[in-house]
Amino acid sequence: MQRSLVGSEMCIRDSLNTVNPNDIESVSVLKDAASASIYGARASFGVILVTTKSGKSGKTNVSYSGSARFSDAIGVPDIMDSYTFAQYFNRASANKGGGDIFAPAVMERIKAYQEGTLKATTVDNGAGIWQKWANANGDTDWFEEFYDHWAPSQEHNLSINGGTDKTQYLISGSFLDQKGLMRHGKDKFQRYTLNGKITTAVTDWFKVTYSTKWTREDFERPSYLTGNFFHNLARKWPVHPAYDPNGFPMDEGEVEQMENGGKQNSQKDFYTNQLQLVFEPIKNWKINLDGSVRTTTQYQHWEVLPVYAYNVAGDPYYTVWDMGYGSYAAGSSRVNEYSWKENYYTTNIYSDYFKQF
């Protein structure tokens, strides 16, 4: 298992997701013993070493870059149309000695809806509730219903660097805004980074480097966007409509849960401060003393809100939030909030001597 070490000559274990790509100078891989000999037990199985940029001598240089892009889901399954689906189910039931899953009258409605001679996706069950599943006649592509065709994102980067022969500095910042692919409910990710680094040669044989890095990650999604949602999505019947004939979200269609069933917000901050002292008592012999501290804080809010289905008259009534998995009764609500803080300290003292023969 490889670890990610981020830094410029001095290193601290970190997540690559917290690094602004524009701040990367180089990426290298050290394997097993080679990495352990330098970074100890934290790198016993190898490391991916990401070296970040440093300031350069010369006039102050200001650089900006920005980009906009779009994402799309790939490899999305093609869904069988509802009439073919119903035929397959009836045939499978007959093969095991059972009766029709879809009655002849329902088959007629399914075909009529596909041909455009019937506008309603379902009918009254006789008790003022819309028919579902094997008694409905919709033609829903559920992947098309829940996945958007494109998701925009934007990224902006700004850096300032410069210095003299003895002192160099670099200040950089970035902003990433990435929208999710869900059509119902809001899912998005935002990342902010701010970095600073200064290196100064105190004497000919003593150099000091100080760097600081702050990264914030904001993540929002519907609380319902969990494993059960994706489990259900691939198993939904195309005959079950996403909306009833009145235009309301259909019971057990999960559109209501995604849009109004609550949301999850997460905010995570990473603060990293690093100090490196390099002594060179004689030419090509360097003694390195590194110290760093990374503080990680996270706050998370997760809520479940009541969700509704609608009867034939258009009146709302409570329905289960989690599609019958039994975790929440119809009409129930819940809020969970938690926060935590972690301090991670590292020190590294090593020496190297370079001689070319």
Where do the protein language model's features map onto the residues?
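Outer-membrane beta-barrel channels and translocator barrels
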Residues: 21, 57, 153, 164-165, ...
